[in-house]
Amino acid sequence: MALPILLDCDPGHDDAIAIVLALASPELDVKAITSSAGNQTPEKTLRNVLRMLTLLNRTDIPVAGGAVKPLMRELIIADNVHGESGLDGPALPEPTFAPQNCTAVELMAKTLRESAEPVTIVSTGPQTNVALLLNSHPELHSKIARIVIMGGAMGLGNWTPAAEFNIYVDPEAAEIVFQSGIPVVMAGLDVTHKAQIHVEDTERFRAIGNPVSTIVAELLDFFLEYHKDEKWGFVGAPLHDPCTIAWLLKPELFTSVERWVGVETQGKYTQGMTVVDYYYLTGNKPNATVMVDVDRQGFVDLLADRLKFYA
């Protein structure tokens, strides 16, 4: 039986590839997709979800737009990474369908209510929508199997020295998620920076030769440009968000640890930092499964294998 999932995302090149991977995987049943502001403005990330589902011929999946700004802060976007549209690079189709006439939280709540079994929430942007769902629908917590997020880091940040972008955009929301008591799985920079796609991997995807694998290669062509900056020391482009989906499909590709994670919302230099109690110094009970390593080649092979689905 396929695992029911709700996908909350802010596409975003790597979010788009996470959608591609999820919908190529019969092990997963994507019940709905909601959009959050983050990599681009809320209007653009919603449009990008619709464009991707139009490309993938999955206009049957309900879509709703989410919060237009973080819980307590002004919105920050990553247009320097993802371009003016949020998905610069390939020529994507215009949407052929409309989002639901409801908010992301309403669609999430409806999906949870109607599911016969608990649903896994996969959140690859800021945690705003998920936090709003948790706060407004405590009666539905038992319908959530787990929350798998791309965000945070045990070590270095990528938006500030201490903070990863998704958590930095809305640290208050992330704190709500980590404190919820629901199992959380964290794909932070410690693992996603090891999930790099090299130029030869992109060419492998392109050579698969179907329309979707070609678009994925073109997304990666654009995404790689930002990551060529010497300051990162990368060989390729880190494919952050698909790590969440890959973990659901093949957890054996990942090394993870159970630890307590807190989110810094006040710090002078550390706002948005995920504080991971690696050495059990706080006495707090672990509240998260934290991914720390990945079999990079296995990850690339999984992507290549699933891209053939779209032939």
From Swiss-Prot:
Alphabetized HAMAP family for the sequence: Pyrim_hydro_RihA
EC numbers: 3.2.-.-
UniProt cross-references to Pfam families, sorted A to Z: IU_nuc_hydro
Note: Strictly specific for ribonucleosides.
Any one GO biological process: purine nucleoside catabolic process
Protein name (Swiss-Prot/TrEMBL): Pyrimidine-specific ribonucleoside hydrolase RihA
Keyword Acetylation carried by entry: no
GO function terms (MF aspect): calcium ion binding; identical protein binding; purine nucleosidase activity; ribosylpyrimidine nucleosidase activity; uridine nucleosidase activity
Enzyme class, spelled out: hydrolase
Activity regulation information from UniProt: Subject to catabolite repression.
InterPro entries: I/U_nuclsd_hydro_CS, Inosine/uridine_hydrolase_dom, IUNH, Pyrim_hydro_RihA, Ribo_hydro-like
Membership in a protein family: Belongs to the IUNH family. RihA subfamily.
Organism expressing this protein natively: Escherichia coli (strain K12)
Entry function: Hydrolyzes with equal efficiency cytidine or uridine to ribose and cytosine or uracil, respectively.
GO cellular component terms listed in the entry, alphabetical order: cytosol; protein-containing complex
Database matches in PANTHER family: INOSINE-URIDINE PREFERRING NUCLEOSIDE HYDROLASE, URIDINE NUCLEOSIDASE
Residues annotated as catalytic: 240
